[in-house]
């Protein structure tokens, strides 16, 4: 058999390396298990970028709790699956796939802090928007979690905010998808700044 041309050999080496890299990335990426084993994202188009919101995999009648570990410490969130099922489902699926890991709290104000943007500038997201869930609006006490809205009114698929204090002037004048409430560690939330990041998000069915 004659020797392969140098270019052909190089192409084979590159292909094998790329395949190995893809396999390694898949192995290192978090994979849902247990109660969330069937929670899958839509088709992944690029890192942290998907074709559509994830299909429903949670039970809206069940109770879910998230522990968000940050560089300042951890806090616990009760997720409002009954009033915001699609928003909670989206949050759980992204969390189970490690979407929020290492993302900065890029927008820090005296009364609110925001995260969930892979670009870290308020313009990024998972490639899709969420539908409004007005049943989850209202009750904006300190510790409330809501999905951010873009200036054109679209609801972000990944950016969310946490109230450190009461909403200035009372409740917001537009509807946000309120999907959770901090039940433990609100003092940690109050200490977060734009230099802090999410280390991990762990969700359990309670």
Stretches found by the model and what they are:
Residues 1-206:
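Cyclophilin-like peptidyl-prolyl cis-trans isomerases
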């Amino acid at each position: 058999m004659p020797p392969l041309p140098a270019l052909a050999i190089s192409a084979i080496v590159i292909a094998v390396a790329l395949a190995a890299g893809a396999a390694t990335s898949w192995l290192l990426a978090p994979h849902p298990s247990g109660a969330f084993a069937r929670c899958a994202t839509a088709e992944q188009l690029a890192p942290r970028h998907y074709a559509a919101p994830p299909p429903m995999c949670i039970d809206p009648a069940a109770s879910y709790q998230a522990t968000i570990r940050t560089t300042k410490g951890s806090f616990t969130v009760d997720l409002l699956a009954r009033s915001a099922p699609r928003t909670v489902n989206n949050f759980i699926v992204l969390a189970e796939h490690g979407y929020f890991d290492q993302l900065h709290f890029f927008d820090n104000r005296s009364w609110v802090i925001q995260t969930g943007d892979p670009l870290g500038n308020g313009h990024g997201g998972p490639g899709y928007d969420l539908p409004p869930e007005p049943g989850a609006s209202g009750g904006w006490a300190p510790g409330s979690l809501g999905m951010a809205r873009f200036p054109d009114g679209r609801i972000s698929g990944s950016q969310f905010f946490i109230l450190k204090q009461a909403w200035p002037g009372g409740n917001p004048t537009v509807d946000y998808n309120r999907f959770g409430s901090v039940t433990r560690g609100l003092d940690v939330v109050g200490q977060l700044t734009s230099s802090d990041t999410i280390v991990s998000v762990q969700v359990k069915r309670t």
